[in-house]
Amino acid sequence: MIATKRITLYEKAVLVTEEYLGPAGERFLRRQINTHLNIEPEQLSKKNLPKLINWSSIAFALLTNNPKVIEAFTNDLRSLILNGK
């Protein structure tokens, strides 16, 4: 029997963020979590997601002026609340 590793919510959020920011995605997300949630990234839970999504979307908007990309990024993060993407 092959053991499968269960992916954490933080790891799922990193995957989403890396789709938009490449390898810098994890560092970006870690900073958002540490700065705005005052928790370690590994402690991320669904109850923290709305605040994280809000701050991450604001910070992401400072990196691009493309509203469609900002909306897609935000919606992809929101999907973690509903289905864990």
Tell me what each language-model feature is.
Residues 1-85:
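Long, compositionally biased intrinsically disordered regulatory segments in eukaryotic proteins
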